[in-house]
């Protein structure tokens, strides 16, 4: 069964009495302006926290910031639940923050590394480097002595390099690079000639100074340019009408009728 709700109608006097009752019983302790005062930074600068006398609020402040909260902040730990601020307050969620204790940690590295470099170690390193360089030089000299490049008179015959490549590939017509260049005249080997003098850049092929010197006399064989006067007048294609008549008379015997227009040639 559904019951309809009727609105409550109060008179002005009844509403005033209810509001006065609420103010007298619930809002009678209104904090003053002095209770809401926040000290400034300049007032906190000279605050003496190391007072000689006993502080009545010392225990309350220590309970407000427990040591576990300070350690958690310094270690960067995330606290999902708010800590217990005072013995009166109960933890929210039914879980308490674990008690943290300071602990000394050893952050030294005890891994064995290379020994410190002293005079004896430097001498040993220098000796090993000298021995390695001597062995490499001896191996290079031995390879240079064992390898002899043949230079036969006829390229490709009685050449050890050619025989090596032929035996390794099975191609009897194969030649080494030096014999190939000599056989097909890719390069011409000749004794080193004397240094040739550098050409004189101030003379041309005819032993004349380059560039030529300017003078008043004109050299022989030079074509002089003919000056032409430039005008804006149009030139006629023919000198007179008789030139056109003479050209057409060569192709036809009938005189040209100049009173009519000439037909276009397709």
Curated annotation (Swiss-Prot):
A motif (LXCXE motif, interaction with host RB1 and TMEM173/STING) lies at residues 107-111. Keywords: Activator, Early protein, G1/S host cell cycle checkpoint dysregulation by virus, Host nucleus, Host-virus interaction, Inhibition of host innate immune response by virus, Inhibition of host interferon signaling pathway by virus, Inhibition of host NF-kappa-B by virus, Inhibition of host STAT1 by virus, Interferon antiviral system evasion, Metal-binding, Modulation of host cell cycle by virus, Modulation of host E3 ubiquitin ligases by virus, Modulation of host ubiquitin pathway by virus, Oncogene, Transcription, Transcription regulation, Viral immunoevasion, Zinc, Zinc-finger. A motif (Nuclear localization signal) lies at residues 261-265. Residues 195-226 are annotated as: Disordered. InterPro entries: Aden_E1A. A motif (PXDLS motif, CTBP-binding) lies at residues 255-259. Residues 39-47 are annotated as: Interaction with RB1 in competition with E2F1. GO terms for cellular component: host cell nucleus. Residues 75-145 are annotated as: Interaction with UBE2I. The keyword Transcription regulation applies. GO terms for molecular function: molecular sequestering activity; zinc ion binding. A motif (PXLXP motif, interaction with host ZMYND11) lies at residues 98-102. It comes from the Viruses. GO terms for biological process: regulation of DNA-templated transcription; symbiont-mediated perturbation of host cell cycle G1/S transition checkpoint; symbiont-mediated perturbation of host ubiquitin-like protein modification; symbiont-mediated suppression of host innate immune response; symbiont-mediated suppression of host JAK-STAT cascade via inhibition of STAT1 activity; symbiont-mediated suppression of host NF-kappaB cascade; symbiont-mediated suppression of host type I interferon-mediated signaling pathway. A zinc finger (unnamed) spans 159-179. Plays a role in viral genome replication by driving entry of quiescent cells into the cell cycle. Stimulation of progression from G1 to S phase allows the virus to efficiently use the cellular DNA replicating machinery to achieve viral genome replication. E1A protein has both transforming and trans-activating activities. Induces the disassembly of the E2F1 transcription factor from RB1 by direct competition for the same binding site on RB1, with subsequent transcriptional activation of E2F1-regulated S-phase genes and of the E2 region of the adenoviral genome. Interacts with host UBE2I; this interaction interferes with polySUMOylation. Interacts with host RB1; this interaction induces the aberrant dissociation of RB1-E2F1 complex thereby disrupting the activity of RB1 and activating E2F1-regulated genes. Interacts with host ATF7; the interaction enhances ATF7-mediated viral transactivation activity which requires the zinc binding domains of both proteins. This is Early E1A protein. It comes from Human adenovirus A serotype 12.
